[in-house]
Curated annotation (Swiss-Prot):
Entry superkingdom: Eukaryota
Cited PROSITE patterns: C2 (PS50004), HECT (PS50237), WW_DOMAIN_1 (PS01159), WW_DOMAIN_2 (PS50020)
Location in or out of the cell: Cell membrane; Cytoplasm; Nucleus; Early endosome membrane
Subunit structure comment from the entry: Monomer. Part of a ternary complex composed of SMAD3, ITCH/AIP4 and NEDD9/HEF1; within the complex NEDD9/HEF1 interacts (via N-terminus) with ITCH/AIP4 (via WW domains); the complex mediates ubiquitination and proteasomal degradation of NEDD9/HEF1. Interacts (via WW domains) with OCNL. Interacts (via WW domains) with NOTCH1. Interacts (via WW domains) with JUN. Interacts with JUNB; the interaction promotes ITCH-mediated ubiquitination and degradation of JUNB. Interacts with FYN; the interaction phosphorylates ITCH on Tyr-420 decreasing binding of JUNB. (Microbial infection) Interacts with Epstein-Barr virus LMP2A.
InterPro entries recorded: C2_dom (IPR000008), C2_domain_sf (IPR035892), E3_ub_ligase_SMURF1 (IPR024928), E3_ubiq-protein_ligase (IPR050409), HECT_dom (IPR000569), Hect_E3_ubiquitin_ligase (IPR035983), WW_dom (IPR001202), WW_dom_sf (IPR036020)
One annotated GO biological process: protein monoubiquitination
Organism per entry: Homo sapiens (Human)
Record: active site: 871 (glycyl thioester intermediate)
Bias kind Low complexity: ranges: 236-247, 282-298
Region spans: MAP kinase docking site: 574-583
Annotated spans, Required for interaction with FYN: 395-471
Record's compositionally biased regions (Polar residues): 270-281
Protein's name according to its UniProt entry: E3 ubiquitin-protein ligase Itchy homolog
Length: 903
């Protein structure tokens, strides 16, 4: 017998709730000759009040599901499996049952469940001993800390009886008593008679067991029936917590509506052993005083509240050493109901709970407002909340805030390609000092692009133009005819749009002169909508019926998506997508899939994975990284990314990050050349232009048909043609040299990656279906438009139970106008699932049932937070009483909400 002074382990790991993924693989059932067609089985998994079901397999005795189910369990939970046969016209028939103890499975697998395959024998419904088949399952995602592995169990033996029990945690205010609600016993050896008191049976001196109930003598009782019946109370094996497979089987009944009041008790003594330690007030410690008990050595001494545990030794029974537990917060009290289950009473808020309350984290304070409502103040962040904070919730929030800041940093880096550097701002300030035309009008700014061309920004209307606003009107130009508009190309060349005939031309209708000699006609911009409609038509022709389910977790989004997308056939990926985030209540009618595309594109295109890189120092468009070969599976990932990008185009979803224009040209099977270098590497482009326009023989540059490239710090030489290192570049062959260098720069070291990308891309969407688009149109088709037109948003919004003149609607649009563009995108993402807009703007927003405009509906009370339905582009806006309240609630909703089913 080990010493009674051994340390008891903490119960925290055994009662901690964790997520467990159960994959129901298959089953083998005995054939029933009465049923010719065979059963249509499905599996129901229940644990701790949760129930999950698989899909049915029609008419088979060997069903195969391979369906993952996610449940919330504790290490001492018990899984119950029921195999049912689906019946069409009557109730389903139970074929067999099986049970699995999680704690025993953890012990046999080193306290870790990682893809553990278990085969269970199914017992009959009427005769449990009869085996009707086998059920194969796979458990994954649960791990117990090493502390529990080393101290989690103790095998004790007395008089021939062996026990294997998990450890027990005792209340700090009771040195020799433990609560009935605890999930097991201690690490220290416990006498067999003491355990017999738990199970309702005692053990005689000869080692035999006799069925005898434990008598408990009480001086007071919380139960009126016990108090009225007498002082003796019987606790049988059925009423006491049973020990099953070495652990306590917890039960969670409905919360008691009116718990019994506490009754003062006297200190207890067991066989002359020292009494319990001095009691503390229930409001401060939450522990209940023990009951005065008189027992025999063969009987378990207990009360309706607590059970004293003794350790048998050479000198007689000794009390167990208690495990120190944090005291209850002020105003809380610990009680035990008539079934021995511990619950906690909050005398301040007048409520009860099963969970032990924790003190407030450092820096938090509890306050009460004028209406008597309790709220909590965080003095670190100077924020308030109605939800009671815990150490775990604060830690999870800090971790989420860190991840969110990292995500925002990545998005900010992507948006920096639209921010001009300090040199441009310095040049602008210098030009203002010596500008002979004087200062610009209010709200205007003069800027210079990467090629040195000057343009002007009107911050009032958020537009840019090539002409100087100070010189407009000085030439006394005639106005354009009605229906005409003058625009400028990316090169600053003016052209004219005739909205009456829907045509464009370089010829000025006022003078009849052309801006270019024989300039080509530019396609009318609205033709792009016709292209999109034509493309969507062909996607519908290629689409497959029904849908496929994609189950991914937010923590392992990249790897889960990779495994599932690569496991499906290309035809299955053309079906309608049904994306599931385990543990969230969102039903995917389009909104969840939009968020999945948005989040996954941010992951797979992240340069940190070394699959893609930024096109240049000041260009945050993405291109394939030549050094991706350091990942041995990089070609598989590029094939996966090709499938993913094709799925985004095929299903009409947007991605978070865009590619470089030459990469879009490759997707369109269009040739790339020297001109494409300008957008990704202006310095390299300008150097080639200088070589083209100057005599290199006079400069004696000694260039050869060979180039150097640096990958991961290693410089390698590449010949543009066979034996190119010995072929000198001259005036006669420099055109060939420039062409080959440009092709090499645009495709250097990425041939295999590009081939793998298009292999996956063409499996979903053949490239010939995109031949009608150009590179910029493809970028808009894949990424959507980023700039939000407030007038277009307000013009195409609809309302339910509100009117355009309602004060809440007017406050909402005032709020949208006041916030910056980033928060507008967040608001748009909160309501629609993505911050990208379709090509046609808000007029072309799509929902689960087709076109669905942005909708604001009057729902809830003024103290509710706004809710959204991303599948229907609908915002549930409660009738707030003031603009400040509406602004506060909306900001909290769009900044702090993540996932679905979060109230």
């Amino acid at each position: 017998m080990s010493d009674s002074g051994s340390q008891l382990g903490s119960m925290g790991s055994l009662t901690m709730k964790s997520q467990l993924q159960i994959t129901v693989i298959s089953a083998k059932l005995k054939e029933n000759k009465k049923n010719w067609f065979g059963p249509s089985p499905y599996v129901e998994v229940t644990v701790d009040g949760q129930s999950k079901k698989t899909e049915k397999c029609n008419n088979t005795n060997s069903p195969k599901w391979k369906q993952p189910l996610t449940v919330i369990v504790t290490p001492v939970s018990k899984l119950h499996f029921r195999v049912w046969s689906h019946q069409t016209l009557k109730s389903d028939v139970l074929l067999g049952t099986a049970a699995l103890d999680i704690y025993e499975t953890l012990k046999s697998n080193n306290m870790k469940l990682e893809e553990v395959v278990v085969t269970l024998q199914l017992g009959g419904d009427k005769e449990p001993t009869e085996t009707i088949g086998d059920l194969s399952i796979c458990l994954d995602g649960l791990q117990l800390e090493s502390e529990v592995v080393t101290n989690g169990e103790t095998t004790c033996s007395e008089n021939g009886v062996s026990l294997c029990l998990p450890r027990l945690e005792c209340n700090s205010a009771i040195s020799a008593h433990c609560n009935l609600c605890l999930p097991g016993l201690s690490d220290s050896p416990i006498s067999a008679s003491r355990v017999a008191g738990f199970t309702g049976a005692s053990q005689n001196d000869d080692g035999s067991r006799s069925k005898d109930e434990t008598r408990v003598s009480t001086n007071g009782s919380d139960d009126p029936e016990d108090a009225g019946a007498g002082e003796n109370r019987r606790v049988s094996g059925n009423n006491s917590p049973s020990l099953s497979n070495g652990g306590f089987k917890p039960s969670r009944p409905p919360r008691p509506s009116r718990p019994p009041p506490p009754t003062p008790r006297r200190p207890a003594s067991v066989n002359g052993s020292p009494s319990a330690t001095s009691e503390s007030d229930g409001s401060s410690t939450g522990s209940l005083p023990p009951t005065n008990t008189n027992t025999n050595t063969s009987e378990g001494a207990t009360s309706g509240l607590i059970i004293p545990l003794t350790i048998s030794g050479g000198s007689g029974p000794r009390p167990l050493n208690p495990v120190t537990q944090a005291p209850l917060p002020p105003g809380w009290e610990q009680r035990v109901d008539q079934h021995g289950r511990v619950y906690y009473v909050d005398h301040v808020e007048k409520r009860t709970t099963w969970d032990r309350p924790e003190p407030l984290p450092p820096g938090w304070e509890r306050r009460v407002d004028n209406m008597g409502r309790i709220y909590y103040v965080d003095h670190f962040t100077r924020t308030t909340t109605w939800q009671r904070p815990t150490l775990e919730s604060v830690r999870n929030y800090e971790q989420w805030q860190l991840q969110r800041s990292q995500l925002q940093g990545a998005m900010q880096q992507f948006n920096q390609r639209f921010i001009y550097g300090n040199q441009d701002l310095f040049a602008t300030s210098q030009s203002k000092e010596f500008d002979p035309l004087g200062p610009l009008p209010p709200g205007w700014e003069k800027r210079t692009d990467s090629n040195g061309r000057v343009y002007f920004v009107n911050h009032n209307t958020r537009i840019t133009q090539w002409e100087d606003p100070r010189s407009q009107g000085q030439l006394n130009e005639k106005p354009l005819p009605e229906g005409w508009e003058m625009r400028f190309t990316v090169d600053g060349i003016p052209y004219f749009v005739d909205h009456n005939r829907r045509t464009t031309t370089y010829i000025d209708p006022r003078t009849g002169k052309s801006a270019l000699d024989n300039g080509p006609q530019i396609a009318y911009v609205r033709d792009f909508k016709a292209k999109v409609q034509y493309f969507r038509f062909w996607c519908q022709q290629l689409a497959m019926p029904q849908h496929i389910k994609i189950t991914v977790t937010r923590k392992t989004l990249f790897e889960d998506s990779f495994q599932q997308i690569m496991s499906f056939s290309p035809q299955d990926l053309r079906r309608r997508l049904w994306v599931i985030f385990p543990g969230e209540e969102g039903l995917d009618y389009g909104g969840v899939a939009r968020e999945w595309f948005f989040l996954l594109s941010h992951e797979v295109l992240n340069p940190m994975y070394c699959l893609f890189e930024y096109a240049g120092k000041d260009n945050y468009c993405l291109q394939i990284n030549p050094a991706s070969y350091i990942n041995p599976d990089h070609l598989k990932y590029f094939r996966f990314i090709g499938r993913f990008i094709a799925m985004a185009l095929f299903h009409g979803k947007f991605i978070d990050t865009g590619f470089s224009l030459p990469f879009y040209k490759r997707i369109l099977n269009k040739p790339v050349g020297l001109k494409d270098l300008e957008s990704i590497d202006p310095e390299f482009y300008n150097s080639l232009i200088w070589v083209k326009e100057n005599n290199i023989e006079e400069c004696d540059l000694e260039m050869y048909f060979s180039v150097d490239k640096e990958i991961l710090g290693e410089i390698k030489s590449h010949d543009l043609k066979p034996n190119g290192g010995n072929i000198l570049v001259t005036e006669e062959n420099k055109e060939e040299y420039i062409r080959m260098v440009a092709e090499w720069r645009l495709s250097r070291g990425v041939e295999e990656q590009t081939q793998a990308f298009f292999e996956g891309f063409n499996e979903i969407l053949p490239q010939q279906y995109l031949q009608y688009f150009d590179a910029k149109e493809l970028e808009v088709l894949l990424c959507g438009m980023q700039e939000i037109d407030l007038n277009d948003w307000q013009r195409h919004a609809i309302y339910r139970h509100y009117a355009r003149t309602s004060k809440q609607i007017m406050w909402f649009w005032q709020f949208v106008k006041e916030i910056d563009n980033e928060k507008r995108m967040r608001l748009l993402q909160f309501v629609t699932g993505t911050c990208r807009l379709p090509v046609g703007g808000f007029a072309d927003l799509m929902g689960s049932n087709g076109p669905q405009k942005f909708c604001i509906e009057k729902v809830g009370k003024e103290n509710w937070l706004p809710r959204s339905h991303t599948c229907f582009n609908r915002l549930d806006l409660p009738p707030y009483k003031s603009y400040e309240q509406l602004k506060e609630k909306l900001l909290f909703a769009i900044e702090e909400t993540e996932g679905f089913g979060q109230e």
